[in-house]
């Protein structure tokens, strides 16, 4: 069976490739119906990644966020026509300690293998999760992005102490919005404060208990824990600002992606006894938990 794959050949140039798809008795075939463009896809397209990385990974189909309909399932897991969310993480082994999205052997669509920008996507059944009936398909296309925040919050609940009266979220973009919204849902008794740079964006956080411009934070502000959702060149400033305002023995969850190292105030990390952890991507259990939320 021929599959049409739309690959990025070089920055700003796509090409159509026709690849043979082997049909077997253990893999499901899904036709993508809604896709979401991630900032990582934009960096590949714009050539904003290192030249060595581009040479190594291109040509490659982009997109790792999306949903689709099952068109073939020899395993009987799904009925034909079932709407599913596609999981981009492709583990090749299981580990009792390390989650599937942190195994160095795992592949990831639109990073170490072709993404979802193709006519058909083929994988074993557990790489697809059935969508709830009636869900808005456009909203469902963002499931992967939301699952990353869900994954980070669940790790935070494991790592942090139980005093969670005030949680700060640095970042007024999509990731900050999604993370703070989930925090409000999963920790309804906690106050969620948002720290950003754009007043128009901060005004969208109507569910938050408070919003602050990072240049106008009250001197007496104190938080128990924090999530960094800034990334890029401003990540260092955001993390250091968190360190300034967080209570001793607080936990800092880092979610923002930076291409360059971000220097932080390690002296105060030690003095306050802070715990800092990073989270990346997500696994099947995160999708299942999110869709049940």
Whereabouts are the PLM-identified features?
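Mid-domain Rossmann-like dinucleotide-binding core that forms the NAD(H)/NADP(H) cofactor-binding site
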Residues: 133-216
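Glycine-rich cofactor phosphate-binding loops and adjacent beta1-alpha1 units
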Residues: 158-164, 186-187, 202-273
């Amino acid at each position: 069976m021929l599959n049409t794959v739309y690959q990025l050949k070089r920055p700003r140039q796509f090409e159509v490739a026709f690849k043979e798809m082997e049909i077997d008795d253990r893999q499901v075939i899904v036709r993508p119906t809604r896709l979401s463009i991630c900032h990582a896809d934009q960096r590949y397209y714009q050539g904003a990644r290192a030249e060595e990385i581009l040479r190594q990974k291109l040509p490659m189909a982009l997109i790792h966020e999306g949903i689709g309909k099952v068109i073939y399932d020899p395993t009987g897991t799904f009925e034909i026509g079932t709407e599913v969310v596609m999981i981009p993480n492709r583990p090749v082994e299981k580990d009792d300690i390390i989650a599937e999205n942190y195994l160095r052997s795992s592949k990831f669509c639109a990073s170490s293998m072709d993404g979802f920008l193709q006519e058909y996507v083929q994988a074993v059944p557990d790489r697809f999760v059935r969508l709830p009936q009636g869900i808005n398909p456009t909203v469902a296309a963002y499931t992967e992005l939301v699952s990353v925040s869900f994954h980070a919050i669940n790790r935070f609940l494991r790592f942090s102490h139980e005093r969670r009266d005030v949680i700060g979220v640095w970042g007024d973009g999509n990731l900050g919005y999604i993370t703070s919204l989930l925090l409000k849902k999963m920790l309804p008794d906690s106050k969620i404060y948002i720290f950003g740079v754009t007043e128009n964006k901060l005004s969208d956080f109507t569910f938050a208990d408070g919003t602050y411009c990072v240049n106008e934070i009250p001197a007496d502000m104190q938080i128990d824990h924090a999530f960094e959702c800034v990334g890029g060149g401003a990540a260092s400033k955001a993390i250091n600002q968190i360190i300034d305002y967080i209570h001793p023995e607080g936990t800092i969850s880092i979610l923002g992606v930076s291409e360059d190292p971000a220097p932080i105030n390690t002296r105060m990390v030690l003095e306050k006894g802070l715990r800092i952890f990073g989270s990346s991507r997500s696994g099947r259990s995160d999708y299942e938990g999110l869709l049940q939320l």
